[in-house]
Amino acid sequence: MRVTSSRLLQGGSLVSRVLKRRLNNASRTKKGWFSTRTLADSNEHLRRVFDDQAYFDNFTKSGAPEGAMNSLFGGNGVGLFRNRALISPQGLVDFSEESLERAKMLVSNMMAEVKTSEQGRLEYIKKLDQLSDVLCRVIDVAEFIRVSHPSQKWVDAAQRTHEIMFEYMNQLNTNVELYESLRDLLIDPAITTKLSKEEIEVGEYLRQDFERSGIHMDPNTRNNFVAITQEISLLGSHFNNDIHSLESYWCNISRSEFDKISDTVVKSEIYGYQSSSPASQNKDSGNIYIPLAGHIPYTILSKCEVESVRRKVWISLHNSPKEQIDTLNAFVKYRALLAKMLGYKSFAHYQLEHKMAKNPENVLTLLRNLQQGLISKEYGVCEEVKKLHSFKNGDDAVMTDEEILEDVKPWDREYLLAQLQSQTLKDEEPLEDISEYFSVGTIVSGLSKLFYSIYNVNLIPEATLKGETWDSNQVRKLNVFDVTSNKKLGYLYLDFWSPKVLPSHFTIVCSRKLNTDIGSESRDEMREMVQLDENEQHQLPVISLVCNLSKPQGTGVGRFTGMDSRKPTLLSLDQVDTIFHEMGHAMHSMIGKTDLHNLSGTRCVTDFVELPSVLMESFSKDPRVLCKIAKHYRTKEPLSKETLAKHQSHRVLLEESETFMQSKMAMLDQVLHNEDIINCGIKDFDSTAVYHHLESQLKVFADKWSTWHGKFPHLFSYGAVYYSYLLDRAIAEKIWHGLFKDDPWSREAGQKYKDSILKWGGTRDPWVCLADALGDERLGKGDSKAMEIIGQKV
């Protein structure tokens, strides 16, 4: 899942020469050290860096430059991600203010030069892109810190930084002079014939964003636009911050309902909470209060035979606070107002204008066709729900499919699924614990093997310096190294044990060629803020992958004493999929290297950006990949295909229903941003009524009671484009069958995929990329026929 926040139009002292030499020497030492090892040794080293805490600690100590490093920074270290300014929360705020001044100075110089010389016009797009990078360098790292950093002081500083930068970025969105200068040079053949294709692509992208930001409006309306956009951003931050909040953290049931629960262990646990529950405060002896934190509510949903108890717990667990729904209603209404101001039928029309899908009508057609296929297909949704229903009423022969879909409620799902799984297990031998073949290090090492095979790219661990990460005990740094060119592609910072964040991919720095040749920035200046390539001509992309995996067993000995190396973090098949998925985003960022940052890596259209990550899930599900990668963490025995097949068969019990549920979420995203909000009156909009009405129509596990939609983060981050996952899944299926089906380790297929899709970032029409990858010219038009082809089952 991509988390970004800051495209330009959406969104000091120098390090000593001595330090520079030491950093370069350290890099050369590590690179040479790696090259002396065999590939097998290097993969084992990579595995141990993640799986063995003591080994990692020694590696970090032995890999760091001399101790004089810290004294050069007054003991504070090199700063987060090697950005000198980010040594403290106040440093982040100072960096934002310095960057703001740097941006204003750049704008002033650009505007003076574009009006007075041809050279100023020729350099204008490069400098506009540089301006974007100056701002993104602040807002992207601030967003990462706000969401992921363990220190509240850093989080507070990130929030202040976001507010400082976002207002200025929105002012740039509606800067008429910036826009007119760009518009005029893009229609001047004397200039465009001397620009690179990438410069023109970025220029057109920025022009579109200007125009979509209401540049044609009168000054008062433009000012309102900026104010509303900023308010939407702040509402979105509040929405995401409260995504896990509940309306209440207790669910009360009657004592008679409690008595019907047969699980004595759960009853005992619930009873133990009563002294701290609302019952003790209200002296409510007639009810029992179930805590909604911890494992108890989930145990009830999967094991409790009392439907009324499951119903109450499920609704309570899915209810959002009223304030959260108010926040959702507010930003959806503001979005509708913005779309109306810009002359669009709806926010969805506004969002999709330049996406692959083109318009909401195409999206709804895609979703309806998908849902119809899932309902009607053999072994589809109806068959899956029928299997569940047989454990509810015993015999469903007298009921129609529609009646069965209506009868199986959302609070029945986990309970009936547990019954189905239990019955399935009775018919089979006990399954071996497959997670013992999937340590974190084994999977990362396996990914390096895969990337070397298909891309000729290695993942090489690098020791971090003091202050470079937010948790030196658990964050690992990888150099993504291209063997073909013998160059670094960029850096990954991986934190698999974050207590705060769902699996996420954060862009910290984008690829960009420095503008040293035109004199608008210097290497000395940039060296303090970013990590540069070997020739110091490009800033290297920096990506952070953060997951919330459980720490290895035996870690309770203290934060600074290290984790028990005897048993590493072991992964389920779902968690393996997640890491493959997020690494798909990361490799897109690394391979999609461009000279201009606005369209580098994952900065492509939103309904294309999930393709690389979704495609990686095809690799993670293929036994030819997993069985070559997986090894038992103790015995080093490989995983057998038979064992994997047995476990995978249990994962597909509700596979079609899962896809249907995702299509419901995508449909909700569309109807909350459609033209009805404008036509029926923005003032009277009620997202809960819309949600319940849609659920009633779509039927499968229909939720007509809770306010779960307040827990759906993509309603803000992916507003009107959540369908992207489903579209990109269809595209990924085509790519897999067209390139990798015969051999998922194929270098030829990997090279074709790199050359046709990954390397372009967002600088090429995605439909043209697909036409190239699949050898089908019809796709290059990107019309309704192309959408139809992609929607066809392979």
UniProtKB/Swiss-Prot annotation:
- Indicate whether Zinc appears among the record's keywords: yes
Instruction: Give an example GO biological process.
Output: protein stabilization
So which domain of life are we looking at? Answer: Eukaryota
Active site feature: 582
Q: Which cofactor does it need?
A: Zn(2+)
Q: What is written in the cofactor note of this entry? A: Binds 1 zinc ion.
Q: What is this protein called?
A: Mitochondrial intermediate peptidase
Where is it located? Answer: Mitochondrion matrix
Which reactions is this enzyme annotated as catalysing? Answer: Release of an N-terminal octapeptide as second stage of processing of some proteins imported into the mitochondrion
Q: What class of enzyme is it?
A: hydrolase
Q: Which UniProt keywords apply?
A: Hydrolase, Metal-binding, Metalloprotease, Mitochondrion, Protease, Transit peptide, Zinc
